[in-house]
Amino acid sequence: QTEHKEDMLRCAERWRELLLEAGCQRTEIMPSNGNPFVYAEYKCGLDDSPTVLVYSHYDVMPVEPLELWHSNPWEPSIRDGRLYARGADDDKGQAMIQVKAFEYLVHEGLMKCNVKFIFEGEEEIGSPSLESFITDHRDLLKADIILVSDTSMIGKETPSITTGLRGLAYWQIEVTGPNRD
């Protein structure tokens, strides 16, 4: 949404700062046809090390209708031991866990692979800029494995590991029939 363009830029910049603080040697905001991408990379310095590409997104669903919120959606709150905030479950919470795990491994000297991060700002509207961004930056995004945390869980009490994704599929079905019974 164009009305939130500045908010999206601030959010992207904050993620860039967090990735730099976590230990990435290169971080940048990269323009696209829509909201910018956040790119960061860490090179471990070991020859022939594999590269992990971490994908996430920083956009969130619209806050409306406000009356359905039990607390201010713009301020995080904890109720019954759970965190409630915009994007806490899709996908900022998962992204923060990945960044903090990366930060720990780097600062403890345990990171033995190269890591690249790519965070987009349009996942909630179907990622219209993602395909062209990947095409334009194919070499930059090259990796041995991709880590995505924006997946489903079997249930609220059952953590899950998704081992493969195949993309999005859209259908439009038109049904016609007789004009009378």
Segments the model singles out, each with a brief description of its role:
Residues 1-66:
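N-terminal helical capping/dimerization or prosegment-like subdomains
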Residues 34-38, 71-73, 170:
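Short glycine-rich loop/turn motifs
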Residues 39, 116, 170-174:
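Beta-strand secondary-structure signal
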Residues 49-119:
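Active-site metal-coordination/substrate-binding segment of hydrolases
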Residues 51-53, 83, 144-148, 170-172:
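Short glycine-aspartate micro-motif
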Residues 89-164:
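Acidic/histidine-rich catalytic neighborhood of metal-dependent amide-processing enzymes
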Residues 162-176:
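Flexible glycine/proline-rich, aromatic-decorated loop/lid segments
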